[in-house]
């Protein structure tokens, strides 16, 4: 009796699979700072760091910038140091 139940369950799953919608996953691009000619992450380079800071002055998360975890940590530390040395503002003023 158990075998017949399992057979009917698998048949139901097969039918359900055909009607199920396909899920489309967009392939993530690689880290823009890990390519061969990428700029070096340094607190003395505010032009690079400002690209990873929001309009309000907050650091953008890696899911938005597509930066790998290792480079995200380096970016966060560089932004913090640049703020302390007054190379970057802590809060951007509204225009």
Swiss-Prot record:
UniProt keyword annotations, A-Z: Ribonucleoprotein, Ribosomal protein, RNA-binding, rRNA-binding
An example Gene Ontology biological process: translation
GO MF annotations in UniProt: small ribosomal subunit rRNA binding; structural constituent of ribosome
Stored SUPFAM superfamilies: Ribosomal protein S18 (SSF46911)
InterPro entries noted in UniProt: Ribosomal_bS18, Ribosomal_bS18_CS, Ribosomal_bS18_sf
Domain of life: Bacteria
One Pfam short name: Ribosomal_S18
Disulfide bonds: none
GO cellular component: cytosolic small ribosomal subunit
HAMAP family found in the cross-reference section: Ribosomal_bS18
Function: Binds as a heterodimer with protein bS6 to the central domain of the 16S rRNA, where it helps stabilize the platform of the 30S subunit.
Family: Belongs to the bacterial ribosomal protein bS18 family.
Subunit structure: Part of the 30S ribosomal subunit. Forms a tight heterodimer with protein bS6.
Protein name: Small ribosomal subunit protein bS18
Species this chain originates from: Rickettsia peacockii (strain Rustic)
